[in-house]
Amino acid sequence: MAKAAGSAAAGEKKGKTNKKFKKKERKHVPHGLAHIQASFNNTIVTISDPSGNVVSWKSSGSLGFRGSRKGTPFAAQQAAMTAANMARDHGMRSLDVRVAGPGSGRESAVRALAAAGLDVRVIRDVTPIPHNGCRPPKRRRV
C-alpha cells in the first residue's frame, strides 16, 4: 500500500514544469558615475548609478583584445564607447567620471564617453597614492 502511494507521488514529480523567466528590467537612471580603471595591461570601464549599483561595464579584454593590445588607448576607447551605449539604453544622460591608474587608456576613455553622447560633468583622478606604505617591487633588469 505504502509503496504504491509512493510510486504515484514519484510519477507526479516527473511531469514537465513550465519555467517562466522574467525579462530583466531596465533601470531608468538619468545621472551616473563612470569608474575608469586604467592599468598598463588593461582598461576597465564601469558605469553605475549614484548609489553604486552597476548599470553597465566593459573592459578591453572582454571586447576581444588580447595580450599587449588590451592596454592601448584604442582598446580603452572601444570599451568606453560600448559601456556608454549600454548606459544610454538605461536612460543615462550625464556622468561624473572617476579615473584611477597609470594606464595609457585614461584620456581616450574619457573622450569616448563624451563622444558617445553622455554629458561629462566632473572628471576626478582617484588614483591611490601611498604615503610611503608598502615597499615597491624590485627594479626590472632587461
Curated annotation (Swiss-Prot):
Keywords: Ribonucleoprotein, Ribosomal protein, RNA-binding, rRNA-binding. It comes from the Bacteria. One of its GO terms (molecular function) is rRNA binding. GO terms for biological process: translation. Residues 1-29 are annotated as: Disordered. NCBIfam families: PRK05309.1, uS11_bact. It comes from Koribacter versatilis (strain Ellin345). Part of the 30S ribosomal subunit. Interacts with proteins S7 and S18. Binds to IF-3. InterPro entries: Ribosomal_uS11, Ribosomal_uS11_bac-type, Ribosomal_uS11_CS, Ribosomal_uS11_sf. Residues 16-29 have a biased composition (Basic residues). One of its GO terms (cellular component) is ribonucleoprotein complex. This is Small ribosomal subunit protein uS11. SUPFAM superfamilies: Translational machinery components. Residues 1-10 have a biased composition (Low complexity).
